[in-house]
């Protein structure tokens, strides 16, 4: 396990970030983020990397050189627009927070309405939230055909939550993400498209 990743997780924890936000920032699962924040100090003291089997392994994706540049993000957004070219839809819904910049660029490129979905992992309240919500300061998507956009799909939980919510008010037709770690091709009848997909190759010696 990269020590740089552990340092980043601990730094975000000390800044007050909850596990869900740490997972979003580092493109890892919430389970891995929680593990790092609880065990990070011990892992840094260890001289050997812990052995992980294929069921426990998580993949750390770092694409800061792309997402830190609006110019480079525009190129990624244009590829996603090409994927969406044959789909008829009215609006773009970006999943907060990583999907919002991409959804903004796509909606501008394709001249579509824009909205955001805030998943429950980003809602910090004393009351337990069962689902996220659609931002009220953006275009209305009620009764419209929409596309869901995110940057990295790890477990697929945020996308599943978005689809379930959106089906109650609109018609989600497709999900498009930059990187997929889940291996999921369809969620509740909604196809999932990706630019890149990661996977674990289990080699038994």
UniProtKB/Swiss-Prot annotation:
Keyword flag Transcription regulation: yes
Q: Which GO terms describe its molecular function?
A: DNA binding; orotate phosphoribosyltransferase activity
Q: What does the UniProt keyword field contain?
A: DNA-binding, Transcription, Transcription regulation
* Domain-related comment: Contains an N-terminal DNA-binding winged helix-turn-helix domain and a C-terminal regulatory domain (or effector binding domain) resembling phosphoribosyltransferase (PRT) domain.
Q: Name one GO biological process term.
A: pyrimidine nucleobase biosynthetic process
Q: Which family does it belong to?
A: Belongs to the purine/pyrimidine phosphoribosyltransferase family. GfcR subfamily.
Name the source organism. Methanococcus vannielii (strain ATCC 35089 / DSM 1224 / JCM 13029 / OCM 148 / SB)
Record InterPro entries = GfcR-like, PRibTrfase_dom, PRTase-like
CDD domains registered for this protein in UniProt = PRTases_typeI
Q: What protein am I looking at?
A: Transcriptional regulator GfcR
